[in-house]
Amino acid sequence: MRPNKDRRTEIILYGLLLIPLLFAAAALAQATEQAQGLAEITAVLSEILHTPSMLRWCASTPKFLLAVLVFYPLAVYCYMLDQADRHPGAEHGTAKWGSAHRLNIKYRNTKDSKENYILTENVRFSTDSHAHKHNLNIIVIGGSGSGKTRFYVKPNALQLIGSYLFLDPKGELTRTLGRIMETKGISVTVLDLVHFQGHYNPMAYLETDEDAIKLAFAIVNNTKPKDTPSGGDKFWDDSSVLLISALILYLMYEAPASEQNFSTLMYMILNCQVSENEMVENPLMMLFGELERRDPQHPAVLQFKSFMLGAKKTLQSILISAAANLYMFNSRKYAEMTSRDEMFLPRMGLEQRALFIVLPDNDTTFNFIATMLYTQLFDQLFRLADSTPEYNGALPVHVRLMMDEFANVALPKNFKNILAVCRSRNISCDIILQNIAQLKSLFKDDWEGIIGNCDTLLYLGGNEYGTYEYLSKILGKETERTKSQSIGKGSRGSSSDSLQTAGRELCMPDEIRRMRDDECLLLMRSEDPVIDKKYNLLHHPNVKYTPDAGGEPYVMPPDYMGDAVTITMGAVAAATAPEITEEMYEQLDYLEKHPEENYYKNEENFSQYDQGD
């Protein structure tokens, strides 16, 4: 209900009604002076009403007008006071179904059809959030087989708007979308945690001491099993953060770029065996001792000294805990994958790029790397937007995170706050879930805050009652008329009918369960809900370039970073990071076939490449 708007309308109507009432009062005053008896008064009134120009001012006119001006507003006030809490036809609720056609007209970008999100078969959503005053964060809920990828992720990816980050279970999106994105000029990068292809080195993005500490915190907290109690292990976790952050800070400031990786970090931990004999120093202690003599206030030294405050046996336990946090880097493939970096995360906000993170759908062991990438991506993009005056706080290229398998990848600790403020940086998140229960499990008491920061919710179907119940509740109630009939039998039989109003959920939980497979439910902030057809992927003009319509699948290129050194983003400006081109692929392919001509085998040329020459 909108009482303020309705009340203003009523006041205007009553004010307009006052004009004919004043005319009638003046006419009645004239008639009572000119005529005697009811019949003559009626005749004079009839003449005045037929010929308004006959109306004259007379001695009693002020009295009649004053009576109207006093009693009419009083009567209106009493009537409105009596009706203030009554809403005829809306006693139990005003929920109603909206129109997909009307939503489309209101929210689509009419100037450029490509600058739209695809929500349903008939609803488009402009990427210009300032025009429609809605954020671009979207929650997509659908059970297994409901078509989250086919009916939502793929159509929106084929719009080719800005930069994308895809969480890609099994690599389906990479195979389907990689080729068309490269064809359309979008740089494609793949981090494959199934086959251990691609390279991502979190240490390449360290720029401040705080970055190093946040990375250590992310390592410790995201490599723990989900069912690990949070309170009991806090001391060991904090101590591990101290040690790991000290080592990261040392590598960040003192080690060459080629050694700034997790393999070196693990090697340093393995060389930090604490002896009961205080006279015996391990190699790591000697390394930090030499650094302390050079710079007693070095941030790495301060962190390491804080770690060394513990008793010897306690330090041994902390070392074991830290090694357990990094045990996966003993794997040769995993160590190789994180030894260099080719993600170039800040550039996603500067040019169109697509980053595919391929995850195993049956094993979450290595998913924590995606969590660290999430954390660093948000940090890098926020820093880029906030620290570059000409961007005015918003990235020049929109960055969209298609977060499939949302519940299976740990999120940055402050994700709720990130979701609330990412709109102003020209970043949006598509949270893709199987049901509401997953969201409740992840965020406990804060799960409603996640939904609150998403102005659009799209339900594709499922088989979980809690989701049905939640959707039925937020759809609201409608007021409907009911008819009851009573019939009395016997020698003096009688019958009676009565009409009443009753409240009913706009859509009951069982009705949501019975939605057709080709239908979806769309809820947008400040709009009536809509049931519409799911978008048909084969209707998209770009689908012809994908395997879904007979196109060639994307094949991951050769390891073009295999013979290169690490490119540290802290030392290379984001806007000038080296461009990876097809020519480079061809050159590396040639060098593999002709190793005797490999220019980069020369150590001097390696150094030149590292300096960007």
Question: Where are the language model's segments positioned?
Answer:
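P-loop NTPase motor domains
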Residues: F23-A26, H134-I427, L442, G452, ...
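Short secondary-structure boundary/capping segments
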Residues: I180-E182, Y205-L206, D445-G449, K473-E478, ...
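A broad, low-specificity signal for short, low-complexity segments enriched in glycine/proline
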Residues: K96-I105, K114-E115, T120-H130, R150-F151, ...
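Flexible domain-boundary/linker segments
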Residues: N261, S339, E390-Y391, L439, ...
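Extended alpha-helical interface modules used as scaffolds for assembling large macromolecular complexes
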Residues: E505, K544-P547
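Conserved ATP-driven motor cores of ASCE-family P-loop NTPases powering translocation/secretion/packaging/pilus
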Residues: L419-L521
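Short loop or secondary-structure boundary microenvironments that flank
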Residues: L359, D363, E405, L433, ...
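Basic- and hydrophobic-enriched, low-structure N-terminal and domain-boundary segments
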Residues: M1-S146, R150-Y152, K477, G488-K489, ...
